[in-house]
Regions:
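N-terminal accessory targeting/assembly segments
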Residues: 1-113, 117
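Extended, highly charged alpha-helical segments
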Residues: 116-179
C-alpha cells in the first residue's frame, strides 16, 4: 500500500498547478461541461492541487488520438507553458492511448477524473481493508496504461549463458507485479 500511496498521481510536497479540460460532446450543453468542471475543481482541491486554468471545447465526437483536437492540444500546451502548469486533468475519461499521446505532446502529466478520485481515496484510506481496496483499484487502473519503455535502460532483455532466451522486459515485469 505504501508503494501505491507513494505513487499517487498528484504530487503533495507543494500544491500543483492544474489545467482543467472539459469537452462538450453532442447531446450535452456548455452548462453541463461547466458544472462538471466546477465539480472537478473541487476534487482537484481535495486532492491537494490548485486549478490554474480551464479549457473547453465543443466536439461531435472525441478525437481518437488526443480526445481534443490537435489545435486545442497546441493551445493547451501554450497555456501550460505560460502559467507553468504541472498537470492537465480531463473531466472526460481518457483511453490509455490518449493519455500517453497527451503526455508526450504536452510534456507533463495528463489525468482524467477517475485518476483524481483514486488519488483522493489513496490519501484517505486508513483501514487495512480500505488500503487494500484502493491499492487494487489503482493497480487495475494502471495496468492498461503500462507502456513499453523507449529507453534501453528500461529493457531487461539479456538472456544469460545457458538460459533459454531473453529475459523479461520492464513492461512484462511491471505487468506481472500488478497482476
Amino acid at each position: 500500500y505504501q508503494e501505491a500511496l507513494g505513487a499517487t498521481l498528484i504530487e503533495r510536497t507543494f500544491r500543483e498547478r492544474i489545467v482543467l479540460v472539459g469537452v462538450t460532446l453532442g447531446g450535452h450543453t456548455d452548462e453541463d461541461t461547466e458544472e462538471g468542471l466546477d465539480e472537478l475543481s473541487l476534487l482537484v482541491d481535495t486532492a491537494g492541487a490548485d486549478e490554474a486554468a480551464r479549457i473547453t471545447q465543443r466536439r461531435d465526437t472525441p478525437d481518437n488520438a488526443f480526445y481534443i483536437g490537435k489545435g486545442k492540444v497546441e493551445e493547451l500546451k501554450e497555456v501550460c507553458l505560460a502559467i507553468d502548469a504541472d498537470t492537465v486533468v480531463f473531466d472526460n475519461e481518457l483511453t490509455p492511448g490518449q493519455q500517453y499521446n497527451l503526455e508526450r505532446v504536452l510534456g507533463r502529466t495528463a489525468l482524467d477524473r477517475t485518476a483524481v478520485i483514486l488519488d483522493i481515496f489513496a490519501q484517505n484510506a486508513h483501514t487495512q481493508e480500505g488500503k487494500a481496496q484502493v491499492e487494487l483499484a489503482m493497480l487495475r487502473y494502471r495496468l492498461p496504461r503500462l507502456r513499453r519503455g523507449a529507453k534501453a535502460g528500461l529493457s531487461q532483455q539479456g538472456g544469460g549463458i545457458g538460459t533459454r532466451g531473453p529475459g523479461e522486459t520492464r513492461l512484462e515485469t511491471d505487468r506481472r507485479r500488478i497482476m
